[in-house]
Curated annotation (Swiss-Prot):
GO terms for cellular component: cell surface; extracellular space; plasma membrane. The soluble form derives from the membrane form by proteolytic processing. The membrane-bound form is further proteolytically processed by SPPL2A or SPPL2B through regulated intramembrane proteolysis producing TNF intracellular domains (ICD1 and ICD2) released in the cytosol and TNF C-domain 1 and C-domain 2 secreted into the extracellular space. The membrane form, but not the soluble form, is phosphorylated on serine residues. Dephosphorylation of the membrane form occurs by binding to soluble TNFRSF1A/TNFR1. Residues 1-34 are cytoplasmic. Cytokine that binds to TNFRSF1A/TNFR1 and TNFRSF1B/TNFBR. It is mainly secreted by macrophages and can induce cell death of certain tumor cell lines. It is potent pyrogen causing fever by direct action or by stimulation of interleukin-1 secretion and is implicated in the induction of cachexia, Under certain conditions it can stimulate cell proliferation and induce cell differentiation. Induces insulin resistance in adipocytes via inhibition of insulin-induced IRS1 tyrosine phosphorylation and insulin-induced glucose uptake. The TNF intracellular domain (ICD) form induces IL12 production in dendritic cells. This is Tumor necrosis factor. The record marks 33-34, 38-39, 48-51, 77-78 as: Cleavage. Its main location: membrane. The gene is TNF. InterPro entries: TNF (IPR006053), TNF_alpha (IPR002959), TNF_CS (IPR021184), TNF_dom (IPR006052), Tumour_necrosis_fac-like_dom (IPR008983).
Length: 233
């Protein structure tokens, strides 16, 4: 074999060597990348399971002594659990048998007087200082609007314990009839509800009344349509 042919064989072997080794290197890099990805994914999954308590040792839910929750949610839950449930409340309904007047009853179905709230002389009495929701609804009914057009009023008044003066806290005026009623128009039945409600800072001993100027138009066909009440907040 000549020297030139030997040199040519060595050069051919050197050119063939990278072609043979190249695919093995590519497969090795691909395997390392896959292994790294699986390792990172497994570590992430393990961290999430430990973080959310899916795996790991079970701990008692009771907090150790001297440990306090300071998060807003914990404070809200703690204050709610300590909030007193004995708040005054009153809900009374109108007496359907009272002719020509609005008289409130507390001993009927769906009425309530609790935690000091009282009904005295047709008035609700506040048992303690605090913030209260005061509300009332009247339902009126009639037949036709001619010749006289009724003007309905609904008023909730307060008699303060500090000064015996009647003050209107809530009031409304409504007319169930149109401004102009043509002569000879058919007398059709009408219904007109008036609801009043508001939140007030009240004192112990304050008294409330709910009144109307035309009690003869009150609708007592169904129970619970005419009511009056207060709720401590």
């Amino acid at each position: 074999m000549s020297t030139e042919s030997m040199i040519r064989d060595v050069e051919l072997a050197e050119e063939a060597l990278p072609k043979k080794v190249g695919p093995q290197g590519s497969r090795r890099c691909w395997c390392l990348s896959l292994f790294s990805f699986l390792l990172v994914a497994g570590a992430t999954a393990l961290f999430c399971l430990l973080q959310f308590g899916v795996i790991g040792p079970q701990r008692d839910e009771q907090l150790p002594s001297g440990f306090h929750l300071n998060s807003p949610l914990a404070q809200t839950l703690r204050s709610s659990s300590r909030a007193p449930s004995d708040k005054p409340v009153a809900h009374v309904v109108a007496d359907p048998e009272a002719e020509g007047r609005l008289r409130w009853l507390s001993r009927r179905t769906n009425t309530l007087l609790a935690y000091g709230a009282a009904l005295t002389d047709n008035q609700l009495v506040v048992p303690a200082d605090g913030l209260y929701l005061v509300y009332s609804q009247l339902l009126f009914t009639g037949q036709g609007c001619a010749p006289a057009q009724p003007l309905l009023t609904h008023t909730v008044s307060r008699f303060a314990a500090s000064y015996q003066t009647k003050v209107n806290l809530l009031s409304a005026i409504k007319s169930p009839c149109p401004r102009e009623t043509p002569e000879g128009a058919e007398a059709k039945p009408w219904y007109e509800p008036i609801y009043l409600g508001g939140v007030f800072q009240l004192d112990k001993g304050d008294r409330f009344s709910a009144e109307t100027n035309l009690p003869a138009y009150l609708d007592f066909a169904e129970p619970g349509q005419v009511y009056f009440g207060l709720i401590a907040l």
